[in-house]
């Protein structure tokens, strides 16, 4: 095959691909069908999959908190009180489903559908397909088989602002689009308010450039940058602020109840101990001694051991958190350096690669006209990422949305009128020859989406398991297959107290999706964690006569400590030391049983404290 023939084949393929793209984007019906089919296929593959788990078990813990399978449930620290109460009511009325995950699935599906439709409507095809592909590859896994509520809040917020800014950009007369945008923004706020707030500067940038563009090209009253147009365009955003404010006030009122306020007051310093660096023991030893705290008392909360209600009071936790090290300039530099190193190591699969590709394609297709948007929006993203990296608070789920918000703001701010606003122009566009640059741009966008979709298919199709559908419809039919879960389910009268890291095996046995029975939960307790001192946790402990878990390990004849030796082999001696220091100086601890876990290196051991 000659070079000229090969070139003709490539050109022909590109024009054919471009024809498909324009037939899709110039038809509202086709965009809706495409959005529905892509949403249905990807969400089905990512939900009915043997892949599960990610970097966090928070969704599983939230699901438990709102399951109705623990006494005195009601609120959860991470989501708005309104969501907590609705989820709890649904779980109580229809316990066969895990309603927290059901609601997350509905939000994810509708938000992704809206992102597809909105991207192809309010952005040029190159940018629209690029954003859809990025969401498929970097966001949907976190919303589905990895199951993290931060990703769900992020995809809802992204969909909301995309619809709102898109309708503002095109002066859309549709009522459905802005209403849907308002709903998604509010859902993002309810699921995790910080994620919605993080998007505001980027979409403010998009709106700013959109209004500046109108001002620069005004030629009549209808296109002028008038006060009336600003007020009219502001109505949906004001609605978002008002609704979020109402839900914020409702949440604040719900947390005024004494038992819930006490949990929140305790968890605040507890989380600081987990999230911020602490000084070496030697530097604070004298202060700790003056407060009646030992070396073990100091280190235990750093390992999520706080279930001693007599030692670790709210006042004690506040004192310990006050010792947290103030970050020095050297710490900031070290954290930023570590962040940059991690980005370089994970570059083939890092969101920053999409950002770089997007910038290159924008500059190639728009020359310098989009440079201000790029500099401002990416500048915001870089500053925010470096700030969170410097203080050590930039997990992947946060970084991903910072860059996606930034890209979306750039894509939306670039001049483009919605196809639905000019039917005559659409018909003309479909019949006239395409410019070479348009063909290249639309083909490039389509190819990036195809690559992202192929990646999704490669990851999910081999793990597709339609048999899971029955478990989603009735979670009580799910039977975990794991030695740790089998041991924890035995009806032998034992009350098991788990190390937090050791309990991960049980969580993963349930695929971080399905919930154990009320009986199971009543006889499996923990040494700490963010649910410590929650009213439902304390009520569950009281049922087992283990209000003070550390002391209960010594005093309750049915209580046993269970750990995975590879991860938490140090815990038996630490727990014994805490008991000896505060309650029974002559207490001893012995291993009474052990068994192999599911992993090749996992060995679980069961310990009994004797007094």
Where are these regions (language model features)?
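Extracytoplasmic loop-helix module adjacent to an early transmembrane segment
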Residues: 39-76, 88-91
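Membrane-proximal stem/loop segments at transmembrane-domain junctions that anchor or position
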Residues: 253-331, 519-536
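Short periplasmic/luminal acceptor-recognition loop of GT-C membrane glycosyltransferases, typified by
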Residues: 485-570
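Short hydrophobic alpha-helices at membrane interfaces in multi-pass membrane enzymes
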Residues: 125-131, 163-186
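Membrane-interface alpha helices of multi-pass inner-membrane proteins
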Residues: 139-140, 176-193, 204, 237-246
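Short hydrophobic/aromatic helix or loop-helix immediately within or flanking a transmembrane segment
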Residues: 73-98, 102-107
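Transmembrane-helix motifs of polytopic, lipid-linked glycan transferases
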Residues: 106-125, 357-364
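Signature aromatic-anchored transmembrane alpha helix within multi-pass, membrane-resident enzymes
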Residues: 29, 175-179, 229-240, 418-464
């Amino acid at each position: 095959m000659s070079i000229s023939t090969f070139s003709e084949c490539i050109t022909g393929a590109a024009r054919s691909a471009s024809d498909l793209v324009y037939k899709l984007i110039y038809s509202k019906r086709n965009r809706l069908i495409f959005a529905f089919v892509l949403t249905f296929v990807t969400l089905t593959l990512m939900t009915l999959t043997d892949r599960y788990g990610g970097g966090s078990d928070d969704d599983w813990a939230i699901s438990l908190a709102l399951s109705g399978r623990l006494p005195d449930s009601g609120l959860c620290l991470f989501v708005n009180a309104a969501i907590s109460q609705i989820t709890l009511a649904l779980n109580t009325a229809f316990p066969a489903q895990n309603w927290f995950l059901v609601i997350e699935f509905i939000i994810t599906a509708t938000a992704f559908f809206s992102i597809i439709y909105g991207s192809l409507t309010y952005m040029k095809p190159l940018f629209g397909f690029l954003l859809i592909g990025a969401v498929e590859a970097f966001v949907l896994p976190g919303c589905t088989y990895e199951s993290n509520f931060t990703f769900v809040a992020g995809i809802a917020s992204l969909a909301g602002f995309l619809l709102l800014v898109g309708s503002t950009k095109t002066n859309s007369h549709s009522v459905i689009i802005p209403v849907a945008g308002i709903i998604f923004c509010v859902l993002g706020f309810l699921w995790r308010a910080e994620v919605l707030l993080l998007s505001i500067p980027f979409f403010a940038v998009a709106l700013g450039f959109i209004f500046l563009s109108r001002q620069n090209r005004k030629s009549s009253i209808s296109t002028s940058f008038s006060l009336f147009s600003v007020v009219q365009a502001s109505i949906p955003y004001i609605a978002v602020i008002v609704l979020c404010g109402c839900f914020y006030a409702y949440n604040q009122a719900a947390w005024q109840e004494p038992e819930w306020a006490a949990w929140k007051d305790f968890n605040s310093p507890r989380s600081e101990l987990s999230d911020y660096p602490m000084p070496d023991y030697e530097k604070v030893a004298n202060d700790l001694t003056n407060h009646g705290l030992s070396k073990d008392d100091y280190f235990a909360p750093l390992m999520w051991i706080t279930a001693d209600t007599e030692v670790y009071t709210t006042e004690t936790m506040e004192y310990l958190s006050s010792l947290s090290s103030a970050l020095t300039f050297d710490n900031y530099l070290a954290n930023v350096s570590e962040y940059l190193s991690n980005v370089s190591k994970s570059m083939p699969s890092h969101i920053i690669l999409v950002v770089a590709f997007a910038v290159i394609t924008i500059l190639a297709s728009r020359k310098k006209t989009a440079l201000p948007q790029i500099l401002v929006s990416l500048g915001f993203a870089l500053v925010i990422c470096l700030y969170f990296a410097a203080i050590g608070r930039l997990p992947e789920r946060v970084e991903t949305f910072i860059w996606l918000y930034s890209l979306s703001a750039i894509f939306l701010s670039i001049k483009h009128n919605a196809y639905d606003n000019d039917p005559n122009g659409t018909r003309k566009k479909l019949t006239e020859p395409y410019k070479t640059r348009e063909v290249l741009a639309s083909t490039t966008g389509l190819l990036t989406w195809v690559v992202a979709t192929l990646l999704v298919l490669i990851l999910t199709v081999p793990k597709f398991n339609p048999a899971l559908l029955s478990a989603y419809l009735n979670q009580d039919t799910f039977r975990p297959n794991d030695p740790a879960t089998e041991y924890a389910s035995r009806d032998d009268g034992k009350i098991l107290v788990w190390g937090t890291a050791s309990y991960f095996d049980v969580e993963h046995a349930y695929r971080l999706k399905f919930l154990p029975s009320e009986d199971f939960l009543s006889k499996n307790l923990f040494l700490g964690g963010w649910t410590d001192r929650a009213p439902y946790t304390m009520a569950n402990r009281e049922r087992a006569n283990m209000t003070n878990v550390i002391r209960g390990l010594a005093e309750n004849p049915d209580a046993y400590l269970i750990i995975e030796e590879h991860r938490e082999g140090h815990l038996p001696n630490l727990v014994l030391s805490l008991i000896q220091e505060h309650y029974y100086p002559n207490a001893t601890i012995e291993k009474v049983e052990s068994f192999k876990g599911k992993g090749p290196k996992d060995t679980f051991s069961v310990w009994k404290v004797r007094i």
